[in-house]
């Protein structure tokens, strides 16, 4: 949103890069049939660098957990007027307890609200656009002034780098997941169609929310959770309901993040697993409670986004030189799978 109309070009770049990366991970998983999803790093980068990237991905996931805790704190303070640290501390305590006790099924059940949150955010964005359509010119001017004054932070110096960084940090989350989706897919074409539809839907949602934020910037620029302010402008009850859904969404995201970090080093249920979960959960909570949510997002996601861009650049080179295709053909032959060019 801070790049104004240039941000729309950034969204198109995001769509192209998300589609490319998603299809790449999917195809690697489909043909290679990894025993463990993280083996994709070694395929893409070689054994030594792949191992480094694998451990870095775990570190990034830990940092993402800290961002979730900061987000819980920001939501609790902004909408529920909770004392500082209370919302984030409660969220961290519940997440640590759930991971230590292995109550992942609770997350599986509540996790089904994810699409509801996305749909609600899109609806709020559309209503906000309709309510503020006549403010486009003045809102664009104000956005430029706020960016120039530093009151609105930008992730990168230009929209192209911002788009690449955004795809980069999301990509680190999605690598192993999409490789596993490809591994289990019965039809490669159906799985590829799913990636395309997902990238399209995600990009449309970004477009809607970006326009909504620009049009409502006079009310949102000093808010850590802008969509909550937009919801409140529509109806206070809607904002409360959406806040609850956000907190549940943060919970269902934080638990798998913390579980992934601990599970990478220790077997679930062991004493070391529980001890490490407690330590990692508390350290992550301290970081999340100490730094402001918007500042933490700009630090964690932007820095990791640039690192993800390096991996993305290597993937493009790997595809352009034909190395990716060669590896998939060899894997298809090894696993008795018909290669689809």
Task: Locate each region found by the language model.
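Hydrophobic, membrane-embedded alpha-helices of multi-pass small-molecule transporters
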Residues: 1, 10-11, 57-61, 65, ...
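Transmembrane-helix boundary/entry motifs in multi-pass membrane transporters
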Residues: 2-7, 30-61, 78-84, 227-242, ...
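Extracellular loop-to-transmembrane helix junctions
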Residues: 2-24, 193-207, 302-310
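Transmembrane alpha-helical segments of multi-pass small-molecule transport proteins
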Residues: 10-16, 53-58, 78-102, 119-121, ...
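Extracellular/periplasmic helix-exit of transmembrane alpha-helices
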Residues: 21-27, 131-135, 165-166, 197-229
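Membrane-interface interhelical connector segments
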Residues: 39, 147-152, 213-236
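Membrane-water interface regions at transmembrane-helix termini and the short interhelical loops
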Residues: 71-78, 93-114, 184-187, 284-299
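Hydrophobic alpha-helical segments and their helix-loop junctions in multi-pass secondary transporters
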Residues: 95, 99, 117-148, 312-329
């Amino acid at each position: 949103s801070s790049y104004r109309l240039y941000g729309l070009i950034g969204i198109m770049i995001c769509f192209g890069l998300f589609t490319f990366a998603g299809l790449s991970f999917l195809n690697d998983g489909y043909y290679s049939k990894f025993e463990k999803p993280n083996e994709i790093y070694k395929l893409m980068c070689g054994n030594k660098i792949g191992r480094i990237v694998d451990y870095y991905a775990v570190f990034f996931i830990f940092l993402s957990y800290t961002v979730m805790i900061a987000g819980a704190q920001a939501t609790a303070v902004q909408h529920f007027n909770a004392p500082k640290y209370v919302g984030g501390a409660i969220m961290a305590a519940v997440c640590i307890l759930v991971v230590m006790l292995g109550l992942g099924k609770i997350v599986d059940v509540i996790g089904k609200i994810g699409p509801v949150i996305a749909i609600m955010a899109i609806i709020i964005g559309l209503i906000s656009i309709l309510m503020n359509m006549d403010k486009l010119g003045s809102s664009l001017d104000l956005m430029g002034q706020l960016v120039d004054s530093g009151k609105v932070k930008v992730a990168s110096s230009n929209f192209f780098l911002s788009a690449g960084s955004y795809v980069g940090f999301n990509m680190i989350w999605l690598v192993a997941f999409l490789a596993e989706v490809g591994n289990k897919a019965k039809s490669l074409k159906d799985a590829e169609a799913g990636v395309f539809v997902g990238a399209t839907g995600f990009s449309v949602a970004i477009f809607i929310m970006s326009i909504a934020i620009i049009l409502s910037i006079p009310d949102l620029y000093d808010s850590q959770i802008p969509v909550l302010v937009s919801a409140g402008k529509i109806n206070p009850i809607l904002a409360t309901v959406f806040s609850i859904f956000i907190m549940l969404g943060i919970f269902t995201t934080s638990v798998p993040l913390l579980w992934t970090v601990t599970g990478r080093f220790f077997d679930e249920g062991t004493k070391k697993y529980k001890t490490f979960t407690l330590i990692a959960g508390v350290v992550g909570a301290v970081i999340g409670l100490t730094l402001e949510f918007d500042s933490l997002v700009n630090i964690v996601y932007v820095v990791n986004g640039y690192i993800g861009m390096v991996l993305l650049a290597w993937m493009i080179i790997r595809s352009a030189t034909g190395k990716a295709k060669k590896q998939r053909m060899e894997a298809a032959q090894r696993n008795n799978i018909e290669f689809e060019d």
